[in-house]
Amino acid sequence: MEISVTTSIALATIVFFLYKLATRPKSTKKQLPEASRLPIIGHTLHQMVGSLPHRVLKNLADQYGPVMHLQIGELSAIVISSADKAKEVLNTHGVLVADRPQTTVAKIMLYNSLGATFAPYGDYLKQLRQIYALELLSPKTVRSFWTIMEDELSTMVTSVKAEAGQPIVLHDKMLTYLYDTLCRATVGSVCNGRETLIMAARETSALSAAIRIEDLFPSVKILPVISGLKTRLTNLLKQLDTVLEDIIGEREKKMFSSNNQPLTEEEDMLGVLLMYKNGKGKDAKFRITNNDIKAIVWELILAGTLSSAAIVEWCMSEMIKNPRVMKKAQDEVRQVLKDKKTVSGSDLAKLEYVKMVVKESVRLHPPAPLLFPREVREDFEMDGMIIPKKSWVIINYWAVGTDPKTWHDAVKYEPERFSNSSVDFYGSHFELIPFGAGRRICPGILFGTTNVELLLASFLYHFDWKLPGGMKPEELDMNELFGAGCVRENPLCLIPSISVAGN
């Protein structure tokens, strides 16, 4: 009987890891709590296939504690499941866990892990994050985008009104708004290639599950080839790269003369980045390449579309299931806006209850239930135990956000829990860190949440909503689908009716 090439490789891999298992030296150091493991594949891998990893890991943490070690393939992972331990890791030991693992998806889709999300910790990342904070996504810059946001909101509201009385998929409407807003803010116009970029964003998200088998056995270099992941990502990158190259090349021709002198002021993010490419940035010593720019523009679009749409979709889902919350939020928006034609950025500060709705929604439905993993740069001690270099640190934020030791009625949807509370999601309150904390906190929180609040306020102001087919609120399913983030398994479909108050 013939044995296939794939089977031969699999058998050789098993023999190799059995040998490593038998010959590795025994540690005399105090060990972190861990569950019993299977040979070679280690812990939980078999449990996570086709499941929701954040829920599997929370169940294990309930048994083994908030700091838990898992051996998954070759990967040594430390899973953190409480606010106080997350604070200890990300604050006390922040520099030591400031690296990112170099995953297969990041290496290919982000031009060898360029950009702020997956770049190795060092001078490049520090400089890039400074540009994000002071130029690309500063509060002043975000305010300058309000006009763009309001313009695109008006277009979206008109589109929804045209379908009033008919079931619509809310996610599709939001994605069009977010893509067009991101493109105008990033590159100055609604660029060609919308469908390619949206398709690439969805594909990248679907392929970016927090833990992929290709990354669990890094010594088996052929694994991404056997699985087909490398081919899928390479083909996807080719399509994406064509669109990004055209956008950047066209803009650069308009910005610079033949002798490299700027012809126009930078009015958007791409303009700022091109100044740095051509040595005309605020720090003339810091230069970036076309690949840097493509990675940055792509991560801005990727992070600013799908995650924001998912947050609003969960907000609307929870309000449909909780009509009391829906009415209270609508009453606030309609009272604040009164007879205005549309929601504006300047209105958001007055929408206190809407902000509570967003906080409560990201607590229960975070855009990334497992925060992007960190990689340990040097051994360090925690709780009398050694956290080894090269381990992954995974913050199970979903476990933190539903921890009954921190939250009263932890699984109940209750925005009022944030009334008269100073807790926010900007990285200082570790019970609410859906966007991360410490040296790798998401640099685009303000931009993203501004879009989320504008979308939500527009839906609440202009429309009343109901489920199709006479479905009752309590019948709406809340099933999750796990990828780079956690979205609804079944997209939210609602029937809008035009509100007299909002029109």
UniProtKB/Swiss-Prot annotation:
Applications (biotechnology): The strictosidine aglycone-producing AJM7-DeltaHYS yeast strain expressing pathway genes of the VOM module, RsGS, SBE (GsSBE, RsSBE1 or RsSBE2), RsPNAE, RsVS and RsVH, accumulates vomilenine. Additionnal expression of pathway genes of the AJM module, RsVR, RsDHVR, AAE (RsAAE1 or RsAAE2) and RsNNMT, leads to the production of ajmaline. Ajmaline is an anti-arrhythmic alkaloid commercially used as an efficient drug for the treatment of arrhythmic heart disorder.
GO biological process: alkaloid biosynthetic process
Alphabetical list of InterPro entries matching this protein: Cyt_P450 (IPR001128), Cyt_P450_CS (IPR017972), Cyt_P450_E_grp-I (IPR002401), Cyt_P450_sf (IPR036396)
Keyword Disulfide bond: no
The entry's keywords: Alkaloid metabolism, Endoplasmic reticulum, Heme, Iron, Membrane, Metal-binding, Monooxygenase, Oxidoreductase, Signal-anchor, Transmembrane, Transmembrane helix
Topology term for the membrane: Single-pass type II membrane protein
The protein's required cofactors: heme
CDD domains in the record: CYP71-like
GO CC terms in record: endoplasmic reticulum membrane
EC number, as in UniProt: 1.14.19.81
Distribution of this protein across tissues and organs: Highly expressed in roots. Expressed at low levels in leaves, stems and flowers.
Catalytic activity line of the entry: (19E)-geissoschizine + reduced [NADPH--hemoprotein reductase] + O2 = polyneuridine aldehyde + oxidized [NADPH--hemoprotein reductase] + 2 H2O + H(+); tetrahydroalstonine + A + reduced [NADPH--hemoprotein reductase] + O2 = alstonine + AH2 + oxidized [NADPH--hemoprotein reductase] + 2 H2O + H(+); ajmalicine + A + reduced [NADPH--hemoprotein reductase] + O2 = serpentine + AH2 + oxidized [NADPH--hemoprotein reductase] + 2 H2O + H(+)
Binding site for heme: C442
Locations listed in the record: Endoplasmic reticulum membrane
Family recorded in the similarity comment: Belongs to the cytochrome P450 family.
PANTHER family: CYTOCHROME P450 71D11-LIKE, CYTOCHROME P450 FAMILY 71 PROTEIN
Biological role: Monooxygenase involved in the biosynthesis of ajmaline-type monoterpenoid indole alkaloids (MIAs) natural products, important plant-derived pharmaceuticals used in the therapy of heart disorders. Converts by cyclization the strictosidine-derived geissoschizine to the sarpagan alkaloid polyneuridine aldehyde, precursor of vomilenine, an intermediate chemical in the biosynthesis of ajmaline. Converts by aromatization the tetrahydro-beta-carboline alkaloids tetrahydroalstonine and ajmalicine to the corresponding beta-carboline alkaloids alstonine and serpentine, respectively.
Protein name in the entry: Sarpagan bridge enzyme 1
The organism of origin for this protein: Rauvolfia serpentina
